[in-house]
């Protein structure tokens, strides 16, 4: 998704291993989407969604509305042991283009807007009750 929005060669993320060796991932083509973008996030926004949010925010391609994201920014591998059991290890950590840690920290929104408690655990929130969506619409005008 980042390839469709970011400029060619914009940094999407850094992967850093335990020896602080960095790999950089950059956008590979020119964007095909060139319009204001407002991303909604909450505490359930995790992993690759956080990477996208961080990439768009740091490259000034989107504003983020909602609450802080979950904070899962690591690469994990499952090693199979001789007895058939497994061991999950963390091999690398993701950083945003500005080298901001994601893991156990999350991505902060540009505009913090909490959902009312009455709709927090509802699968489908009516538009009129969705304070985050209402703020995004207001910002888009």
Regions found by a protein language model. Give the residues of each.
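Gly/Ser/Thr-rich loop/hinge elements
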Residues: 1-47, 74-79, 95
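Extracytoplasmic/secreted envelope proteins and their assembly/folding machinery
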Residues: 2, 6, 34-37, 49-53, ...
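C-terminal recognition in membrane/secretory proteostasis and scaffolding
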Residues: 15, 58, 80, 114-141
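Envelope-exposed proteins and targeting segments
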Residues: 33-36, 60, 74, 85, ...
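Short, well-structured beta-strand/strand-turn elements
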Residues: 46, 59-72
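Short beta-strands and strand-coil junctions in structured, solvent-facing domains, enriched
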Residues: 46-47, 84, 96-97, 122
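Beta-strand-rich C-terminal secretin pore/gate domain
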Residues: 60, 73, 81-82, 109, ...
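Conserved P-loop NTPase
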Residues: 76-79, 87-119
């Amino acid at each position: 998704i980042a390839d469709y929005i970011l400029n060619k060669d914009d940094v999407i993320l850094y992967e850093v291993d335990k020896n602080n060796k960095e790999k950089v991932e950059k956008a590979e083509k020119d964007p095909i989407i060139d319009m204001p973008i407002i991303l909604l996030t909450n505490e359930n926004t995790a992993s690759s969604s956080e990477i996208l949010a961080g990439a768009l925010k740091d490259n000034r391609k989107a504003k983020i509305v909602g609450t802080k994201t979950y904070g899962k920014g690591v690469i994990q591998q499952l090693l199979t042991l001789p007895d058939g059991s497994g061991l999950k290890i963390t091999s690398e950590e993701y950083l945003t283009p500005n080298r901001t840690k994601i893991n156990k920290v999350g991505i902060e929104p540009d505009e913090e807007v909490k959902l009312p408690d009455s709709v927090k655990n509802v699968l489908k929130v009516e538009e009129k009750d969705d304070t985050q969506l209402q703020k995004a619409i207001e910002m888009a005008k």
